[in-house]
Amino acid sequence: MKQNRTFLVAGLLLALAITTSIVLTGSSNSNLSKTNLAKCEKAVKGPLYTDCYVLYFKTEVKEKGFKTALNDFTAYTRKTNDIEGACHLIAHKLGETLWEDYLANVEKIDPTVCSYGVIHGAFIQAAKYLTPTKFSETLVGACDISPDPAICVHGFGHALAEAKVTHTQANDSCQAINSHYKDKDFYIFVPAACSEGYQMGLADHAEYLLDKDLGTMYESCKAFNELMFNGCAKAAVMTYSRYQPNDLARDLKLKEMINFCKANMFENCNRGIGRGLNEAFPPYLVSIKKQAEMMEKYCSQTDEVKQCIDGLLGQRIFATNYGYKEAKLLCEDTTKLKSLCREALGEIPSTSPNKKSSIVTIV
């Protein structure tokens, strides 16, 4: 049986290698240069901007290998102030290309690079190629040695969504992962992290949001048990404003979110609104000043203003390498909410993975 599993995994890895080769095949000469990175830096903020970096580092994986690519990516994000807030998003895509090497070298890699973005991407890709049982057996060890297993487990949720399991099936899978950590000090954070990752993973695909209102998404979250429901529901609120074509559409969605939380109050609902603000007005598209203005406009309309502020600050810090420093600047750019903003920022744990960052080298 063990030998058969070995052959199965080997076959899957070979298939992935062939697929990756087909996608990345190009000139035999190196396509990498500082000129190409400069083009990415000058690209218009948005999908073209992030896709440019994804292509660059995916190509580097093919030409220079996994370790060099990840080291260069890590160093570059530090040097360029987080690639204008898109670090976590790009790291997801990079992790998808590296997953088999990532798992083979996981003990040598700092998963906090871009707020666990690389490991989340690796998990998402692994879910496509491994059976649910093999997936759990293989990847739970990756979180065991992680500095913050709860954030790591969040990536399990993303992967479950990518595997297209139902809410009920996701509940069962998250339950199994929760059981693995039930005796750990940090267990309180694990259940919601898994269910939240799942719901966010669903919303990574624009078509998922096309025919769903917030109430429908909220009801679907009730498939999760009590410990996991809030994580799913918060993520539903958070992602509801994604993929809006203009400010008017975003305004309508955000007001709907605010009214929904007033009518269906559950723990962390207004924190979901704050996190949704960071989704609707992401750091790689708008200035700190613009985010501060949006925080004042929308958080002021909620029933729990400080919780809303905390959600925005927390998401910004999580999604970027330099988010904590920029969150301080955001607080200083507010007028009406400056005191509450400073207070909320001061309560964010000093152990936040990106409060301090250092370049990680794989040896």
Set out the residue ranges of the language-model regions.
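N-terminal Sec-pathway targeting helices
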Residues: 1-13
